[in-house]
A protein has these predicted regions:
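Gly/His-enriched, cation/cofactor- and phosphate-binding structural elements
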Residues: 1-96
């Protein structure tokens, strides 16, 4: 959740443009999509409901376009447990 917007988080999916766009179109209750890899690189996608470039900038000095952006979390630690990743990202979102 980011400022009342609902998002989907994936871990190590990679190449998210097509699956993220398809997911967001098929699930209009979701406003954004984030995939983070084991090195802390995140890709963000949206379908016009939230500015993910602004989100990426505020999260970790990232950037991009309104519907497609990215950033790198320098303090991210590789983990196996998805719940740890989810907690990490939600804590970051809560701070912006």
């Amino acid at each position: 959740i980011y400022k009342g917007h609902k998002g989907l988080l994936t871990y190590c999916l990679g190449s998210i443009s097509i699956p993220a766009n398809a997911f967001l179109r098929a699930n209009p209750e979701y406003d954004f999509f984030i995939d983070i890899n084991k090195k802390g690189n995140a890709s963000l996608r949206a379908d016009g409901k939230v500015d993910v470039a602004l989100m990426a900038t505020k999260l970790a000095n990232g950037g991009g376009h309104v519907n497609a952006s990215g950033c790198k979390f320098e303090d991210f630690k590789e983990v196996i447990d998805f719940n740890e990743v989810k907690t990490y990202i939600q804590n970051k979102l809560n701070k912006i």
